[in-house]
Amino acid sequence: IYLCTNAILLKDFLDRLPLSPYLTLSIHLDGMEEDHDRVVDQKGTFKLAIEAVREAKKKGFRVTSATTFFEDTTLEKAEEFLDYLKPLGVDGITMASAFRYPDAPDQDHFFGRKKTFEFFDKLLEKNKKGRWDINHSPLYLEFLRGKREYSCTPWGNPNYSVLGWQKPCYLLDEGYAETFNELMETTEWENYGHENNKKCADCTAHCGYEATAVEEATSTFRGMVESAKLVFQ
């Protein structure tokens, strides 16, 4: 379970959460303080999130960051932020580029698909000798660099909240199912992905594409070999 949170109240709830290898606290952090607070439109949230990261690590939780880069994120800003996370002991970094989904509060600062690939190709080229602990599979990172073409697997990362199971993914607000079976059986999965739905046209998010990359890496001999080579590069 990846428990996604903005971490504003997380410190107050840590004692209620079980310490488990199957639970990861995924903390929303969209850059350094100025950028993060601007993106979420609330001053002080970056400091609260960082305090929560430190406290969660102190208590023994597995903690990752959930980071979105926007069009105005420079390579220098991204490097500074990723370097900042290292001494905090964050167990992994998940990254995505923002894309213009219908309910996004900010409709003006998005990478297109082409710019996404260009940005991550340059950024990931700087990730030498384990500089950053990136919590993605090797083949997904190749996709993010524009070196592979994948289709979305929208059912690969089911999302549950107090409202129920979100259809089809957390980036598109198209209702909720009361049960997991209802989610799987009533969602028209074939209607999603950048080839099939204009809402998804610029999406490269790991919630849909990581599952596709992992399937290739674990279900084909070629995928296994290519994935292994990338790990040891």
Regions found by a protein language model. Give the residues of each.
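Short, acidic/turn-prone active-site loops that include or flank metal/cofactor-
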Residues: 7-8, 29-33, 221-224
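Structural motif corresponding to alpha-helix initiation and N-cap regions
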Residues: 7-11, 75, 79, 186
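Flexible mid-to-C-terminal extensions adjoining Fe-S/redox cofactors in radical SAM and related proteins
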Residues: 165-233
